[in-house]
């Protein structure tokens, strides 16, 4: 059978993270590198695994060693969140002061972004016009048709990026996922407590209106997605099934989509839904891509896609014909749904340049550009018209295989801080300044309607939301308030609001608040420049959750 009405199965034994240790990891390194990178007490790691049920002690070691392990178990049993976040909190991701933008200078994405933000054709100095000057030009009738164009509106909004905490909701366990619906009317949050919470975001509200207990959950809900019609949502976990559930109505109807995997321990780390809602795409820990057809009510494809865990999947655009996938082999692959066959699983191309596993992929929505987040502590921007050569793919595979650290509980090795470009790296741009530790941290393009997609934003293992300028590569905003890693981030499709979901158990909504006037925002006349700044005004507060 393809689907069933599933029953609650509890949390299960689960795993302490999304992925098992990488296959092929552990090649020899120099003694100097090992001394630099070794900063984890192996006994503490073992205690953590024992506490989570991932390993068992069978025999040997002596009573003294067992007593020592038990002491660690007892001392840290009530402090899991501190363990999960402490390495990320100590890590200070290096910021790239001089990003290499040479590949972007002659690529069409530069023109696209400048056109979408009203900067195309302007001299560099004019692109930095202050907001008051733009208003002055509009009043003089110098704007097109007497009003701001959509691009100029996006440029105006860039002056008002979220900078203040407007709302917080707290959970008893880690928040794993949090996304806005396509129309921005609903926000969905998934927590390790097996509960999926839905928030009403209409008319400036952010109010919880429904809580749903997830089914067949092992460890945690790992990914969520809305159906295109906005009436249902899907979620995945350490389970053979992807579940779909209704948003509206009195009761909760959970339908389990059976993927029929070959692995005994199976997890779907990433899911996506086609634009017509018919096909569900999943990336799993067995290195395979799965396609489930909801009309046929069965799994229609199981493609051997990567040499290791598939951590990220995405559709390239609204046609849902081109797919992206990324895994722990550090390769991003591009697939054509019309030519995918189980007996001949060949992608149409591959994108190589990362030095460690890929944690997330987001498409720009135009079937051409995408970004990928990676355990090598970088985000890369790709153009699928520039596939990588065999040399580039081999360089990425070799770099990933030679990694001898585990991002879930070890510090980032110092060699990963180096600004190194692999041979054959076909990426357009590399963004540095955020941390990727503990979990599959997400990154995304900013919305097209409000920002012209001129920004890239990401969660961070240090508890921040990091916003990059897409064209310059520089960090334009850091939102800091969480006490553990931020796993997921979501920007409202039409408003200047960002929601962060963190392992500290908090959901935070960030919005713009005028705190003070800055020099470049003041009119240039001496009379206005000397006028006192008004008293700061707080924006309208949000309603408390029910």
Curated annotation (Swiss-Prot):
Keywords of the record: Phosphoprotein, Repeat, Ubl conjugation pathway, WD repeat
Disulfide bond sites: none
Keyword Phosphoprotein carried by entry: yes
Function: May function as a substrate receptor for CUL4-DDB1 E3 ubiquitin-protein ligase complex.
Pathway(s) it belongs to: Protein modification; protein ubiquitination
Modified residues (Phosphoserine): 75
Oligomeric and partner information: Interacts with DDB1 and CUL4A.
Name of the protein described by the UniProt record: DDB1- and CUL4-associated factor 11
Annotated region (Disordered), positions in chain: 1-40, 523-546
GO CC terms: Cul4-RING E3 ubiquitin ligase complex; nucleoplasm
Residue ranges with Low complexity bias: 1-19
InterPro entries, alphabetized: DCAF, DCAF11/LEC14B, G-protein_beta_WD-40_rep, WD40/YVTN_repeat-like_dom_sf, WD40_repeat_dom_sf, WD40_rpt
GO biological process terms held by the UniProt record: exploration behavior; gene expression; memory; proteasome-mediated ubiquitin-dependent protein catabolic process; protein stabilization; protein ubiquitination; respiratory system process; response to oxidative stress
Bias kind Polar residues: ranges: 536-546
WD repeat windows: 170-210, 216-258, 263-302, 305-345, 353-392, 435-480, 481-520
Keyword Transferase (UniProt): no
């Amino acid at each position: 059978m393809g689907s069933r009405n599933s029953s609650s199965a509890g949390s299960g034994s689960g795993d302490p993270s999304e992925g098992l240790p990488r296959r092929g990891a552990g090649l020899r390194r120099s003694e100097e590198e090992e001394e630099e990178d070794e900063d984890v007490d192996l006994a503490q790691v073992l205690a953590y695994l024992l506490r989570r049920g991932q390993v068992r002690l069978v025999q040997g070691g002596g009573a003294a060693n067992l007593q020592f392990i038990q002491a660690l178990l007892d001392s840290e049993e009530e402090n899991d969140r501190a363990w999960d976040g402490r390495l990320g909190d100590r890590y200070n991701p290096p910021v790239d002061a001089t990003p290499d933008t040479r590949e972007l200078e002659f690529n069409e994405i530069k023109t696209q972004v400048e056109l979408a933000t009203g900067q195309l054709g302007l001299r560099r100095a004019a692109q930095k016009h202050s907001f008051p000057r733009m208003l002055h030009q509009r009043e003089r009738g110098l704007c097109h048709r007497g009003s701001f164009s959509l691009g100029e509106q996006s440029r105006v909004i860039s002056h008002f990026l979220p900078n203040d905490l407007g709302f917080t909701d707290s959970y008893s366990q880690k928040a794993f996922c949090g996304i806005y619906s396509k129309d921005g009317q609903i926000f969905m949050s998934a927590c390790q407590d097996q509960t999926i919470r839905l928030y009403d975001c209409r008319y400036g509200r952010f109010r919880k209106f429904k809580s749903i207990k997830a089914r067949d959950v092992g460890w945690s809900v790992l990914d969520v997605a809305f159906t295109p019609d906005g009436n249902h949502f899907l979620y995945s976990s350490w389970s053979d099934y992807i579940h779909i559930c209704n948003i509206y109505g009195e009761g909760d109807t959970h339908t389990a989509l059976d993927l029929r995997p070959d692995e005994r321990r199976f997890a779907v780390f990433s899911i996506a839904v086609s634009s017509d809602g018919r096909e569900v795409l999943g990336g799993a820990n067995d290195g395979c891509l799965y396609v489930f057809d909801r009309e046929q009510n069965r799994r229609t494809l199981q493609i051997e896609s990567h040499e290791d865990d598939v951590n990220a999947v995405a559709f390239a655009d609204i046609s849902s014909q081109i797919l992206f996938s990324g895994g722990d082999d550090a390769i991003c692959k591009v697939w054509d749904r019309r030519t995918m066959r189980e007996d001949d699983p060949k992608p149409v191309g591959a994108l190589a340049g990362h030095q460690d596993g890929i944690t997330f992929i987001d498409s720009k929505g135009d079937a051409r550009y995408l970004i990928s987040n990676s355990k090598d502590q970088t985000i890369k921007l790709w153009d699928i018209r520039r596939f990588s050569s065999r040399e580039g793919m081999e360089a990425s595979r070799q770099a990933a295989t030679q990694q001898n650290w585990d991002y879930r509980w070890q510090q980032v090795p110092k060699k990963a801080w180096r600004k190194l470009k692999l041979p054959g790296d076909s990426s357009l741009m590399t963004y540095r300044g955020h941390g990727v530790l503990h979990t599959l941290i997400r990154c995304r393009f900013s919305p097209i309607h409000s920002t012209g997609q001129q920004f890239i934003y990401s969660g961070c293992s240090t508890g921040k939301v990091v916003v990059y300028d897409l064209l310059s590569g520089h960090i334009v905003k850091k939102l800091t308030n969480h006490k553990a890693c931020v796993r997921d981030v979501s920007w409202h499709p039409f408003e200047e609001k960002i929601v962060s979901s963190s392992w500290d158990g908090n959901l935070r909504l960030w919005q713009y608040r005028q705190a003070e006037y800055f020099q470049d925002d003041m009119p240039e006349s001496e009379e206005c420049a000397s006028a006192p700044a008004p008293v700061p005004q707080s924006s309208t507060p949000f309603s408390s959750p029910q």
